[in-house]
């Protein structure tokens, strides 16, 4: 009821303004920013501003109004900072002052022309000479700009969250800095940035369920990409030796604190290296990013001190299972009957055509992942679950593959690429023959096999989940907090 009443009065003010003024003007220009004002003049004393007339023109959203008779203090803010505005009858006419103060509400966007000064409490402020109402806010803002209390509203109305929540603003500014520094690092290391299709004729590069769309003119179904992997490797066949892509992937699967159907990844591929070299690149990349943002290699996340100093810990998937599963041995997890019983004891639903490798992965996900707090490369992934990775020379059941875990989250997946077209073809066909209920979207990619037949040089490639990395570097615990517009259930259901 209170909100309805306030909306009524705000609309009434707007209608009065329509009669006499050019409302929603677009001819106001800033000559600086609030951030630059603070940076350049914060340390100057009151006398400096008495002797130097600093004329500024700035704009922002009103977040507080204090009316004190013949003068008033406003506070305006933009995405970066805030500043106090002083307006009085002495600086503009009495009639204009009364009219302006009567018009204004918290949430309005105003332009201010004035001079800088410092108050008796040494607060850097703007003495207003002219004030322009640029946008009238008809709806009142929640909770006096102290932040939204309802997390669901934060996700559905991100604009309100950004206006009222400093942590959210900082999170998304930091996200931009992280991505910019990833790009700087890759370019510094002589990688070429490329773009590959977002719509695929068949889903490839992963086992996830795809989103399906339809091209009307061609009358064909297309799939939003699960991963760009197969296209990127075709570019290595074409002669590129160091490439990367930062873009969206789509997986038609469940929502969780670390899963969103639409997410951002950086994938990169390098010719003439193997997965050991690849791990060094990943270490250097993360070390570079953390140092650029925090000027140190250690950060706090969820009360853990995370150390990004090189080298990161390495452990095989098999050793990690034995370490975190009591009384489980290497021989146990190599025997199909015993490992099946172990999986069932952990309440894992086992499908009949799962082999030892798939069961190891399921047990690892259930019992080990959450314990990997410090940056850890888990290596020696089973061939059964790694159809695109090169098998080890001395053991064809495991591959030259790693996944990087930080704070219990997988943030990277890389391996030495399988470049034998015959072996790759056999792997694809074996996948098709043994696909489980959760793997019904596996297809045989003939074009990729054809490209391998022209010759893929020895190559290693890696994908890094940007959203999960941002979660860790901004101390957020849900992927929804680091994606501006996360996927949500229908609010009406």
From Swiss-Prot:
Subunit structure: Homodimer.
HAMAP family found in the cross-reference section: Lys_tRNA_synth_class2 (MF_00252)
Organism: Wigglesworthia glossinidia brevipalpis
Keyword ATP-binding among record annotations: yes
One GO molecular-function entry: lysine-tRNA ligase activity
Catalysed reactions, semicolon-separated: tRNA(Lys) + L-lysine + ATP = L-lysyl-tRNA(Lys) + AMP + diphosphate
Family: Belongs to the class-II aminoacyl-tRNA synthetase family.
Cofactor: Mg(2+)
Keywords: Aminoacyl-tRNA synthetase, ATP-binding, Cytoplasm, Ligase, Magnesium, Metal-binding, Nucleotide-binding, Protein biosynthesis
Biological-process GO terms, alphabetical: lysyl-tRNA aminoacylation
Location of the protein in the cell: Cytoplasm
Free-text cofactor note: Binds 3 Mg(2+) ions per subunit.
Domain of life: Bacteria
Record's keyword annotation contains Ligase: yes
Coiled coil segments of this chain: none
Residues involved in Mg(2+) 2 binding: 410
GO cellular component: cytosol
Record EC number: 6.1.1.6
Primary residence: cytoplasm
UniProt-listed Pfam families: tRNA-synt_2, tRNA_anti-codon
Name used for this protein in its record: Lysine--tRNA ligase
Binding site for Mg(2+) 1: 403, 410
């Amino acid at each position: 009821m209170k909100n309805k009443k306030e909306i009524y009065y705000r609309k009434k003010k707007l209608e009065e303004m329509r009669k006499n003024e050019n409302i929603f003007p677009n001819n106001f220009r800033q000559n600086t920013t609030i951030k630059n004002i603070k940076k350049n003049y914060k340390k100057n004393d009151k006398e400096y501003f008495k002797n130097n007339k600093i004329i500024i023109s700035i704009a922002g959203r009103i977040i507080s109004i204090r009316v004190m008779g013949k003068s008033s203090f406003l506070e305006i803010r933009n995405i970066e900072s805030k500043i106090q505005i002083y307006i009085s009858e002495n600086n503009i006419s009495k009639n204009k002052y009364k009219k302006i103060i009567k018009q204004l509400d918290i949430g309005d966007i105003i332009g201010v022309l004035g001079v800088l000064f410092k108050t008796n409490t040494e607060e850097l402020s703007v003495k207003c000479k002219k004030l322009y109402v640029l946008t009238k806010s008809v709806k009142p803002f929640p909770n006096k700009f102290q932040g939204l209390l309802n997390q669901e509203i934060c996700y559905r109305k991100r604009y309100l969250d950004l206006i009222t929540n400093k942590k959210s603003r900082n999170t998304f500014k930091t996200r931009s800095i992280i991505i910019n520094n990833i790009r700087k690092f890759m370019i510094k290391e002589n990688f070429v940035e490329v773009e590959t299709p977002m719509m695929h004729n068949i889903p490839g590069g992963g086992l996830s369920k795809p989103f399906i769309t339809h091209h009307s003119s061609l009358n064909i179904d297309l799939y939003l990409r699960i991963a760009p992997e197969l296209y990127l490797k075709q570019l290595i066949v074409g002669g590129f030796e160091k490439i990367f892509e930062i873009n969206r992937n789509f997986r038609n699967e469940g929502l969780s604190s670390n899963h969103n159907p639409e997410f951002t990844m950086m994938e990169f591929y390098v010719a003439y290296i193997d997965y050991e070299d690849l791990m060094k690149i990943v270490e250097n990349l993360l070390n570079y990013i953390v140092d650029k943002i925090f000027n140190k290699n250690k950060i706090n996340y969820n009360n853990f001190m995370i150390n990004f100093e090189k080298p990161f810990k390495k452990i095989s998937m098999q050793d990690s299972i034995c370490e975190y599963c009591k009384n489980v041995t290497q021989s146990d997890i190599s025997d199909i009957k015993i490992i099946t019983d172990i999986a069932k004891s952990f309440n894992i639903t086992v499908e009949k055509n799962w082999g030892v490798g798939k069961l190891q992965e399921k047990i690892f996900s259930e019992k080990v992942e959450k314990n990997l707090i410090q940056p850890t490369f888990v290596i020696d992934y089973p061939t059964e679950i790694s159809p695109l990775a090169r098998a080890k020379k001395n053991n064809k059941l495991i591959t030259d593959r790693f996944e990087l875990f930080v704070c219990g989250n997988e943030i990277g997946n890389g391996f030495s690429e399988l470049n034998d077209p015959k072996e790759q073809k056999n792997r694809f066909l074996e996948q098709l023959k043994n696909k489980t209920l959760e793997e019904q979207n596996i297809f045989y990619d003939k074009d990729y096999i054809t490209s391998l037949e022209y010759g893929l040089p020895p190559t290693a490639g890696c994908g890094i989940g940007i959203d999960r990395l941002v979660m860790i570097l901004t101390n957020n615990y849900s992927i929804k907090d680091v994606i501006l517009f996360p996927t949500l259930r229908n609010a009406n259901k």
